[in-house]
Amino acid sequence: MMPHIFLFLEIFSQEGGIQSYIKDVLQAYLTLPDCEAAEVFLLRDAPDCPNPFKNQGITFHYLKNNSATLGRIQLALKFLVSLLRKRPQRVFCGHINLAPLTRLYCQALDIPYTVLTYGNEVWEPLPNSQKQALQAAASIWTISRYTRDLMCEANAIDAKKVAILPCVVDEEKFNLGEKSLTLIKKYDTENAKVLLTVARLWSGDIHKGVDVTIRALPTILETYPEVKYLVIGRGDDRPRLEALTKQLGVDKQVIFAGFVPTEELADHYRLADAYVMPSREGFGIVYLEAMACGIPVISGDEDGSAEPLQDGLVGWRVPYRDAEKVAQACLEILPGQDQRCHPQWLRQQTLTKFGKKTLRAKLEQLI
């Protein structure tokens, strides 16, 4: 008998908070006893994707296909064959879209399964097949109290079966340091106060608050005329946001940097005087990354960011669509006098609660 099977939509072919979180979970899993026999099925990843876990004992099945339908058929067949041959102790379903298939097979074979959930994919009432798959699961893992509460209320889930497995930050990759002279020159920020957001600019999810922060700039500029707003990320919403900067007359202050590789993110965080993302998040790994680099943060006040910000202990929480409140929080941060602006304190508070050792301990407890 093998210990576990995992199913995910994709991990390596897309960048984003969910993908980053799953990689952290797998990395922690690899440090646990008997993990080497596990199998991972990836619906949308191809064999040539950059996989840092290759040759570490886990077997990966890449099922990306030019036809989405054929890819799902291949997943269904290969997953069933693996269940019949190896009879795992437990299946971990990494996305609600895969939960109905997981339920169908696991209930028939009397194999317990766990569903991993993250954010807005489970905040609203789900189709019956997905709702029933959650209700029938042996357990559900999610990343925040906020997602747990919304999911349970919307889908009649017993909260007792839901465990919190929070996001964590890579303290070695995201650390304190000096501002990069290369980036200062690249973005022309030598004498500027810098606000930063890292987010996908997707028109289907305008809740990252980039437009709200842009609307806050005229007020901030009255006190800090040299302020710059650096937006890292790519997506189809960029033209709308660029048009908004011109409409408000702040296009000279906003820098759309596009995609930045993960290995270069820490230097970009350290360039900032404040990380600003007044959004609706299931959690928000980017807040942890910024704070681990010693950068103060602003989040929304109606979402899962309450956890990385420790209910306001280590950051500013504002109404996520209120540009004036965002401006006010920025004006409180930029002088750098508040306790929540002290880099060493901010990093220590963050790592104590959201370091990788915490994730491993929690994962071992749950498994």
Predicted regions and their residues:
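Short alpha-helical donor nucleotide-sugar binding micro-motif in glycosyltransferases
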Residues: 259-260, 267-272
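Acidic donor-binding loop of glycosyltransferase active sites
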Residues: 195, 253, 270-282, 295
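Conserved acidic donor-binding segment of nucleotide-sugar-dependent glycosyltransferases
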Residues: 310-312, 316-323, 332-338
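A short, well-ordered alpha-helix in the C-terminal region of glycosyltransferases
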Residues: 226, 339-353
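Conserved donor-binding/catalytic core segment of Leloir-type glycosyltransferases
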Residues: 7, 189-208, 214-217
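Short hydrophobic beta-strand element within catalytic cores of glycosyltransferases
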Residues: 296-300, 309
